[in-house]
From Swiss-Prot:
GO biological process: cytochrome complex assembly
A Pfam family recorded for this sequence: Cytochrom_C_asm
Assembly information from the UniProt record: May interact with Ccs1.
Protein name: Cytochrome c biogenesis protein CcsA
Stored PANTHER family: CYTOCHROME B_B6 PROTEIN-RELATED, HEME EXPORTER PROTEIN C
């Protein structure tokens, strides 16, 4: 009973901290002068990581098995993975924007796990025979870590596309404004006082320099995180194939979950290939990564919604 109470306490604490982190991010967007809030939000995600870690360990102790048995436990592990991904660059003193991505991802995942699922699913149950294997921890944990990494990388690529698209709109608007200026005597007089139109153009380039640096960082971290997720996915699929051979006598059965896992892995491989070709880097590779965002969620939730196939033990029903 004490473990159940402790689990509820840790769940509420972690959820509250993530909510505070998101509020902090909104404040930094409105008030740029409060620099310390950004660092505080990243520390809040680290505190969330330890809370969810305690929650999973507590559930592991009183259930007697690694907490990856059902959809609720996998969602909590996914939320834990989002927090874990943030910690690596943070402790290496790299400036990044992971907390902007991981905080909403973690709170949405945890909100759905705690509020979107029925309370019966929250109860830990005995492992079904197919899951009573030492491969459970290796296969499922690697796949969930890959989902978290690939989702973060995809969101970073989506952010890159949005910023680039807005930049192109601003440049088009600025060009159209320049075409109107020569017809206005007042504007020509103003430009003469400023000595040249080039000065205004330089100001625009200076204003967009920070945006350029941001897109470069987003592209860099998106590539690194997706590469990490691709590695986890490869390990997870290989370990799952070995486990399937032991449990069902075949390495691959083209189960719906296996099929979508293969599609997810293929998209990640295509993205990695586009990064090796300089002509395909930037926007093209970001579009491929953005496609992976939808495919990953189909892979993760698709079988659970349908409730069919060899992996249907984790379905909503």
């Amino acid at each position: 009973m004490i473990f159940v109470i402790l689990e509820h306490i840790l769940t509420h604490i972690s959820f509250s901290i993530i909510a505070i982190v998101i509020t902090t991010h909104l404040m930094t967007l409105l008030v740029h002068e409060i620099v310390g809030l950004c660092d505080s939000s990243e520390k809040g995600m680290i505190a969330t990581f330890f809370c969810i870690t305690g929650l999973l360990v507590t559930r592991w102790i009183y259930s007697g098995h690694f907490p990856l048995n059902d959809l609720y436990e996998s969602l909590m592990f996914l939320s834990w993975s989002f927090s874990l991904i943030l910690m690596v660059p943070y402790f290496k003193n790299h400036k990044n924007h992971f907390s902007t991505i991981t905080a909403p991802s973690a709170i949405c995942t945890q909100s759905f796990a705690t509020s979107g699922l029925s309370t019966e699913i929250h109860q830990s149950e005995i492992l079904v025979p197919a899951l009573q294997s030492h491969w459970l921890m290796m296969h499922v944990s690697m796949m969930l870590l890959s989902y978290a990494a690939l989702l973060c990388g995809s969101l970073l690529s989506i952010a890159l596309l949005v910023i680039t698209f807005r930049k192109n709109i601003d440049m088009i608007g600025f060009t159209n404004h320049l075409l109107i200026w020569p017809f206005s005597f007042g504007e020509i007089k103003y430009l003469n006082e400023k000595r040249s139109l080039l000065k205004n153009t330089s100001f625009l380039l200076f204003r967009n320099y920070h945006r350029y640096q941001l897109t470069q960082r987003l592209d860099h971290w998106s590539y690194r995180v997706i590469g990490l997720g691709f590695t986890f996915s490869t390990i997870g699929i290989l370990s799952g194939a070995v486990w399937a051979n032991e449990a069902w006598g075949s390495y691959w059965n083209w189960d719906p979950k296996e099929t979508w896992a293969f599609i997810t892995w293929t998209i990640s491989a295509i993205y990695s290939h586009t990064r090796t070709n300089k002509s395909l880097q930037g926007m093209n590779s970001a579009i491929v990564a953005s496609m992976g965002f939808l495919i990953i969620w189909i892979c993760y939730f698709g079988v659970n919604l349908l409730g069919i196939g060899l992996h249907s033990y984790g379905s909503f029903t």
